[in-house]
Amino acid sequence: MTNSEHASIEQYVNMPELLARVDNDSELLTELFALFQEDSPKLRDALDNAVRAGDLRQAEKTAHALKGMLANLSMKHGATLAANLEAAARAGDEGEIQRAMAAFNADETGLLAAVGRFMAGGEP
């Protein structure tokens, strides 16, 4: 396991901002995190498939969807990484796409682990 897989939720999510967005509704926060756990891997797989197929337009669209989801959940670093990936796909820069994918996937792995621990009650 990498250090990112042991990182706390606060390293990935601006919790004060997110709690304000949901009006401190812990039930809504739990629902949003559950949706994230369900949707994020599907979108990441779709992104991987689009990149492997050379469908950069689809990769750009999927990266854009990931960026929006992450930004709405106050996951700013992940949203920035998705934005970098979106820009690389738009530019058609294969080398940058690969670098951006590696950075995004590493961050997303740690983020999903942190959300999982949070959901399991493993941290506040």
Residues of each region from the PLM?
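Two-component system phosphorelay core
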Residues: 1-124
